[in-house]
A protein has these predicted regions:
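Glycine-rich beta-alpha loop segments
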Residues: 62
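Short, well-structured alpha-helical segments in soluble
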Residues: 103-115
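A short, small-residue-rich loop immediately preceding and capping a beta-strand
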Residues: 113-133, 144-149
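Glycine-rich phosphate- or other oxyanion-binding loops that anchor nucleotides, phosphorylated ligands
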Residues: 100
């Protein structure tokens, strides 16, 4: 370790070192907690942003795991300062955690700015906590390391493995079709999530922690360690030790989050069979780092980077436990080889290439080779056309190939309850060729782009044996979801995007190979409809939700707040201390 700072150069010294009344108060209040001066004087003070909560089962172990982080910090000669941060539980937070991703980003940035800290360990994992914490820490710019929660153990039902989320949708459809008893459903409920940790499919949580590692923000191999594995404890204490070194080295996010790192993260996301939610989060994180990333860049990567991780829902069999014991993300990145920029710096202080030395794959069916991929292209594709001028997203490998090229009449719903009532009507007049549409669920209209985009297959079609159909929305869907779902339509309908003009019976046409999505309605008719269109009222009339709807960007740029983007204005200065 090469020290680039002396103790008097530590940021926290501004609070504690001066011989004045204010600093005396800071020292006195620290001693009030039972600490002696020598425990923190001249040492890096490390913030631990802990997203533990009783309402977040994915982070249940963080209540104890934080002690392992503290142990590592103390071992390395630092002083830990645990700061609780907003815990975004995908299980409980409504209408959607995406409504609060930007709030967590704001909180993380301000927690780090306002406290006497020199570096940070970010403890997250469940879906939006990863981008929220990372976005805030990027904007603050202190040395930081990301500690992923890790996936839960695989589920079990009657001796068969269950994948969180993915099998919930699957078995619920069977219950709606009359093929599953109530008692059998209770067994599925009890067996699908049986330990702490985030979803063990390649959903949004596993996707985003993999992206964090590919960006260079975690220790090598950290992203796929199961939460219940003792290796997770050892990794946590190693994070504590390493962040102290990073402070002395002055290794800050802007040295790690380069264009090369972002390109690596995009390629890795595609190769993992990533969640569609990766799109809005990658765009937002890159923009926070001042790095250009567009939907076109993501689509280009999707055309050239095959899916290698045979993990559900894109894969057919395996779960994250299998992925980790097959070699984990290091093995997958090693197989990508020169498709990644091996010179990119990581929080370890080593280049990506150096961290991948010795990486092995122990199961070539779980982590495929470039010559034998799960899917010949990447996980995601971007469609554009008169229905989505700025873009829409689909996950081709996770849907029936019949729908890669399709046209059919639209069945349009303006609200979720309206759609829910229709799909539960066994007499609904619908065919497998219809395109089900839900609008009013985008960043402003939702608000927050709720995960409603995997519209349920209507009972009328389930009973005929159908399990997929084309669905279209300005909403998102869970990363554990699957099916022919076109999402993130931009501009959204709430702001007058073309989706707002679509009517029942209009023909919707998609062509995955051509990357197009259109409604076959002539321009004169669309002009008449636009003249008649009236913007819907906002759903929230005060407080944070009101602010969110007025400042959130569209999905094609990452749905961050306009006033938090890098180019909006000068970053806040260090706080005055009087």
């Amino acid at each position: 370790m090469e020290k680039k700072k002396t103790a008097d150069m530590l940021r926290s010294a501004r609070w504690f070192a001066p011989d004045d009344l204010r600093s005396s108060g800071h020292r006195s209040r620290t001693m009030q907690m039972g600490y002696a001066l020598e425990e923190w004087t001249g040492k890096p003070i490390i913030a631990i942003l802990n997203t533990w909560s009783d309402a977040n089962p994915c982070h249940a172990h963080f209540k104890h795991r934080v002690e392992d982080v503290k142990r590592g910090i103390l071992q390395a000669g630092g002083f830990p300062l645990e700061l609780p941060a907003l815990s975004l539980s995908e299980s409980y937070v409504k209408p959607t955690t995406m409504l609060y991703r930007n709030m967590l980003a704001m909180e993380a940035e301000e927690l780090l700015r306002s406290h006497p800290v020199d570096g940070a360990v970010l403890m997250g994992g469940c879906d939006k906590t990863t981008p929220g914490l990372v976005m805030g820490a990027i904007s603050m710019g202190l040395p930081m390391i990301y500690l992923p929660a890790g996936p839960m153990l695989r589920g079990n039902y009657q001796g068969k493995p269950l994948g969180s989320g993915s099998d919930a949708w699957k078995y619920w459809d069977e219950r709606r079709a009359g093929n599953l008893t109530e008692n059998e459903w209770v067994e599925v409920e009890a067996g699908i999530a049986r330990s702490y940790g985030h979803c063990m499919t390649m959903g949004t949580a596993s996707t985003m922690t993999a992206i964090a590692e590919a960006l260079g923000l975690t220790l090598p191999g950290a992203s796929s360690i199961p939460a219940a594995d003792a290796n997770h404890i050892r990794m946590s204490s190693a994070c504590g030790r390493r962040i102290v070194e990073m402070v002395w080295e002055d290794l800050t996010p802007n040295q790690i989050l380069t264009q090369a790192a972002v390109n690596n993260a995009v390629a890795v996301a595609m190769a993992t069979g990533c969640s569609t939610n990766a799109v809005v989060h990658l765009l937002a994180m890159a923009r926070r780092a001042g790095i250009k990333l567009t939907l076109e860049d993501l689509d280009r990567a999707g055309r050239t980077t095959p899916v290698l991780a045979n993990i559900r829902p894109t894969g057919k069999t395996y779960l994250m436990e299998d992925f980790y014991y097959a070699g984990g993300l290091r093995a997958l990145m090693a197989k990508l080889g020169d498709r990644l920029d091996q010179t990119a710096l990581t929080v370890s202080g080593l280049s990506l290439g150096e961290t991948l030395k010795g990486a092995e794959c122990f199961n070539d069916d779980v982590i495929r080779s470039l010559d034998n991929p799960v899917y010949h292209e990447g996980s995601l594709a971007v469609l554009k056309g008169n229905l989505a001028p700025n873009g829409a997203v689909i996950k081709p490998a996770a849907c029936d190939p019949r729908f890669h090229k399709h046209q059919g009449p639209a069945l349009v719903f303006d609200t979720y309850p309206e759609m829910k009532a229709a799909v539960d009507d066994e007499n609904l007049d619908i065919t497998p060729d219809h395109v089900m549409v839900l609008r009013g669920a985008g960043p402003q209209g939702g608000p927050g782009m709720p995960e409603w985009g995997m519209l349920p297959i209507p009972k009328a079609l389930l009973k005929q044996g159908h399990r997929d159909m084309l669905r279209l929305s300005d909403a998102r869907m869970s990363g554990t979801s699957y099916g022919a779902c076109i999402l993130h339509v931009s501009p959204e309908s709430h702001v007058g995007g073309p989706l707002a003009l679509l009517r029942n019976g209009d023909i919707v046409k998609i062509d995955l190979e051509a990357r197009t999505i259109d409604m076959l309605v002539d321009e004169d008719e669309l002009a008449r409809r636009r003249a008649d269109w009236v913007q819907p009222a906002d759903k929230i009339g005060r407080g944070y939700g009101w602010m969110f709807a007025r400042h959130v960007a569209q999905a094609d740029t990452g749905a961050d707040f306009d006033f938090l983007e890098t180019g909006f204005g000068k970053t806040a200065a260090e706080p005055d201390i009087y």
